[in-house]
Curated annotation (Swiss-Prot):
Keyword annotations from UniProtKB, A to Z: Ribonucleoprotein, Ribosomal protein, RNA-binding, rRNA-binding
GO process terms (BP): translation
Alphabetical list of PROSITE patterns matching this protein: RIBOSOMAL_S14
Organism the protein comes from: Synechocystis sp. (strain ATCC 27184 / PCC 6803 / Kazusa)
Record bears the keyword Kinase: no
Known role: Binds 16S rRNA, required for the assembly of 30S particles and may also be responsible for determining the conformation of the 16S rRNA at the A site.
Protein name: Small ribosomal subunit protein uS14
Gene3D superfamilies: 1.10.287.1480
Matches recorded under SUPFAM superfamilies: Glucocorticoid receptor-like (DNA-binding domain)
Length: 100
């Protein structure tokens, strides 16, 4: 189980990403449309002024059950340990143990 502080920090980052997503996307589009270097620098500075944790790549994918940050399966939102347990218990529809 991950530390509660790390899980909460990641939740806070997720909220910031959602809050600033529209503004960040608008600024990025404005940056693409800017023609002069001065305009691009001004828009870039506005992007830099946004909170650091509002960038989507600062988020970390974590298991929804344990909060484990590694060996995360995106299709399920679970780490490998929980995925294995739940698959054995039949809690994941359509997931079967492979056999060849």
């Amino acid at each position: 189980m991950a530390k509660k502080s790390m899980i909460e920090r990641d939740k806070r980052r997720s909220r910031l990403v959602a809050k600033y997503a529209a503004k960040r996307e608008a600024l990025k589009e404005e940056f693409r449309q800017a023609e002069t270097l001065e305009d691009k620098l001004a828009v870039h500075q506005k992007l830099q002024d946004l909170p650091r944790n509002s960038a989507p790549n600062r988020r970390r994918n974590r298991c929804q059950v344990t909060g484990r940050p590694r060996s995360y399966y995106r299709d399920f939102g679970l780490c490998r340990n929980v995925l294995r347990e739940w698959a054995h218990q039949g809690l994941l529809p359509g997931v079967t143990k492979s056999s060849w």
